[in-house]
């Protein structure tokens, strides 16, 4: 067998006020009877990597789609959470954005310089997230 990539997943939380979508934020606040200053249960993708030999072939997006689908199922049966969070390296940020993750409003200005950051500090981390409601039920082929 060949290992072409790996992913680690752990439980975590994030402040509800970080969510960009005001409608979703209000919906969650009302549903759970909490304020936006509360922590929201989350699943965190701790590490996610694809062997360089297999990079740029769509394998990362395919694996991520299947991981997200598994997380969606987990949220319905085993673990109560609404968002998936990642501390993404600058060099991986485009990958996650392409796969529907959101950046934080507080990072919008610095992200205008992302190309420079990728060159000067490729492992700089950005906190990003994905709302479970944005996960499609079927994985990519």
Give the predicted meaning of each segment:
Residues 1-5:
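Glycine-rich acetyl-CoA-binding "A-motif" of GNAT/NAT acetyltransferases
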Residues 6-47, 109-116:
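Conserved acyl-donor/pantetheine-binding loop and adjacent beta-alpha core of acyl/acetyltransferases
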Residues 15-17, 93-95, 136-138:
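Eukaryotic short linear interaction motifs
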Residues 46-56:
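A short, internal acetyl-CoA/4′-phosphopantetheine-binding micro-motif in the GNAT/acyltransferase core
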Residues 56-71:
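Conserved acetyl-CoA-binding loop-helix of GNAT-fold acetyltransferases
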Residues 75-77, 81, 86-113:
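Conserved active-site alpha-helix within GNAT-family acetyltransferase domains
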Residues 87-91, 109-141:
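C-terminal "cap" of GNAT-fold acetyltransferases
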């Amino acid at each position: 067998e060949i290992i072409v990539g790996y992913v680690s997943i752990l439980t975590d939380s994030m402040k509800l006020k970080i969510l960009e979508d005001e409608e979703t934020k209000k919906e969650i606040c009302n549903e759970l009877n909490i304020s936006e200053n509360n922590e929201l249960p989350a699943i965190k993708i701790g590490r996610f990597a694809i062997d360089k030999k297999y990079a740029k072939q769509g394998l990362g997006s395919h694996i991520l789609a299947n991981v997200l689908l598994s997380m969606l199922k987990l949220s319905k049966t085993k673990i109560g959470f609404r968002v998936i969070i990642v501390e993404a390296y600058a060099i991986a940020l485009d990958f996650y954005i392409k796969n529907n993750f959101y950046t934080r409003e507080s990072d919008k200005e610095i992200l205008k310089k992302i190309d420079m950051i990728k060159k000067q500090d490729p492992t700089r981390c950005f906190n990003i997230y994905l709302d479970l409601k944005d996960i499609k039920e079927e994985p990519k082929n």
